[in-house]
């Protein structure tokens, strides 16, 4: 995997990369700095809801919005082998450069699950650690202390990462 990413000569000739730079443009443009009183920074942030106040990150399986329909059409057209969703954690203070959430590998099954769990995930984690980037798995904290434990986030089909594992 790391050789594939470093060496441009090994890229397949038919590789297609699709990027959606901002999925929730209405929320991104709705900037504020005072609605999260318990949060120290950032200076400005967007809003979870879109211009019609739909939380687009929780609309994938319901598809109540045009955004979700456009995503579904694009996803079905491209049929990606790999799907990556990056976004902020709504102000949670995790104290890490990056929190990551790989879908539960058993949702994928077969060779893809094995590749995700045994190759891609460990190689990415090791690569970031070797670059001195503090990383940790994304967990639900729900106002609990570390001593009482944390639960892993379940990416159900309402979220992009859960939705995309259905296909």
Where is each model-derived feature located?
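Hard-cation-handling environments
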Residues: 141-167
